[in-house]
Swiss-Prot record:
Residues of the transit peptide: 1-27
Biological processes, Gene Ontology terms: mitochondrial translation
Further facts: Present with 3460 molecules/cell in log phase SD medium.
Taxonomic lineage of the native organism: Eukaryota, Fungi, Dikarya, Ascomycota, Saccharomycotina
InterPro entries: Ribosomal_mS45
GO molecular function: structural constituent of ribosome
Organism: Saccharomyces cerevisiae (strain ATCC 204508 / S288c) (Baker's yeast)
Keyword tags: Mitochondrion, Ribonucleoprotein, Ribosomal protein, Transit peptide
Name assigned to this protein: Small ribosomal subunit protein mS45
Taxonomy, superkingdom: Eukaryota
UniProt cross-references to Pfam families, sorted A to Z: Bot1p
Cellular localization per UniProt: Mitochondrion
Function in brief: Component of the mitochondrial ribosome (mitoribosome), a dedicated translation machinery responsible for the synthesis of mitochondrial genome-encoded proteins, including at least some of the essential transmembrane subunits of the mitochondrial respiratory chain. The mitoribosomes are attached to the mitochondrial inner membrane and translation products are cotranslationally integrated into the membrane.
Family note: Belongs to the mitochondrion-specific ribosomal protein mS45 family.
Subunit structure: Component of the mitochondrial small ribosomal subunit (mt-SSU). Mature yeast 74S mitochondrial ribosomes consist of a small (37S) and a large (54S) subunit. The 37S small subunit contains a 15S ribosomal RNA (15S mt-rRNA) and 34 different proteins. The 54S large subunit contains a 21S rRNA (21S mt-rRNA) and 46 different proteins.
Length: 345
């Protein structure tokens, strides 16, 4: 609510001007975003007790505290351990976020301040679709949680590529995983094995790994609905802007012509390039058949890093003296490569 002044003036014959001012109140169009479900609102209270209905609704949602200051009766307090994410679902629970910490039965805060079972059983929380459980944002049904891989599956992928000599394309088609993800699994498993040999995996890392693994759903290659779309092409950055082109009515215009207008390669070439990504792909040896000279420095005892020197062409590396370098700037330009990954330009 704001205040303003409005004035009028009048002038009588033979007299000076007369001004009249009136104070007017202007109401703001903004409305407080109260919860859409019913909750206990504040009544008459002491003027010095500065409390709001939003704070009251928040306390009703969180529930009572224990002696440690933790909201143990809130269903979102504990970390899930059954590979089912526990995302907030306000459109289904409608304020019923409390449950017994032992029996897991729903509770509701009554108007007299006591806790008890809800008078009406919420049937929305009984028959929930599986896709709804994987939705982290209630208002965005298109965003779904990805599936994590079990340690046994990651070890199998690592052995099939490094020991049996299979290519990344063969493993990708077998398990229904994208080639960049298969390459990342091989790299991460090799790093994890090297850390285990050196005893560099602490107990905190193991605890965090087990906790995150139990929080998210597990990937199953036998289930067809869990397999990834291997023919999916990342959206190029140049297609996000509109392009207008005037052509004749009888002139043919297809996807290849659209790719030329947008300065993009056809989808067939993009899929072919995506299939050769990674050092374990079938076409990697043919694409990198050039001999490169590498010189390794002497590894001093006690050090974990080793210098590596490779040949470089002048003008291809480094920055020219006097040229602008925006590596440390906040507004550095960001682009996207063929895989859809963000890269600095």
């Amino acid at each position: 609510m704001s205040y303003g002044l409005t004035g009028t003036s009048s002038k009588l014959r033979g007299t000076s001007s007369i001004f009249s001012w009136t104070q007017v109140r202007h109401f703001s169009r903004r409305r407080i975003a109260y919860p859409f479900y019913p909750f206990k609102k504040l009544g008459r209270q002491h003027p010095k007790k500065h409390d709001t209905n939003l704070k009251t609704a928040m306390r009703q949602f969180l529930g009572p505290k224990n002696y440690k200051g933790e909201y143990v009766m809130n269903k979102y307090f504990t970390v899930p351990t059954n590979h089912v994410p526990n995302y907030i679902k306000p459109d289904l629970e409608r304020g019923q976020s409390l449950e017994h910490p032992v029996t897991k039965k729903p509770l509701q805060l009554r108007y007299d301040g006591t806790l008890g079972p809800p008078p009406v059983e919420n049937k929305r929380l009984q028959n929930i679709f599986k896709d709804r459980l994987l939705q982290p944002f209630p208002s965005n049904p298109h965003c779904k949680t990805n599936y994590v891989l079990s340690p046994q599956l990651k070890q199998s992928i690592f052995e099939e590529i490094t020991v049996e000599g299979l290519s990344a394309q063969q493993v990708s088609q077998k398990y229904g995983l994208k080639i960049p993800r298969v390459e990342a699994i091989v790299k991460l498993v090799s790093v994890e094995n090297s850390w285990n040999r050196r005893n560099r995996v602490s107990s905190d890392l193991k605890t965090m790994d087990e906790t995150l693994y139990r929080m998210f759903p597990v990937f199953d290659s036998d289930a067809s609905f869990k397999r990834e779309n291997l023919s999916e092409i990342p959206v190029p950055q140049k297609t996000l802007a509109s392009r207008f082109l005037t052509i004749a009515e009888s002139e043919p215009f297809g996807p290849v012509d659209a790719a030329h207008v947008l300065e993009l390669e056809p989808a067939v070439e993009t899929l072919r390039n995506l299939s050769t990504v990674g050092e374990h792909s079938s076409g990697h040896q043919q694409s990198t058949n050039k001999n490169t000279k590498v010189i390794y420095g002497e590894l001093v005892e006690g050090e974990r890093s080793q210098y590596k020197f490779t040949n470089a062409k002048v003008g291809k590396v480094g920055y020219r003296y006097g040229s602008g370098n925006r590596d440390n700037k906040k507004d550095r330009r960001i682009g996207f490569n063929k895989l859809g990954q963000m890269v600095y330009i």
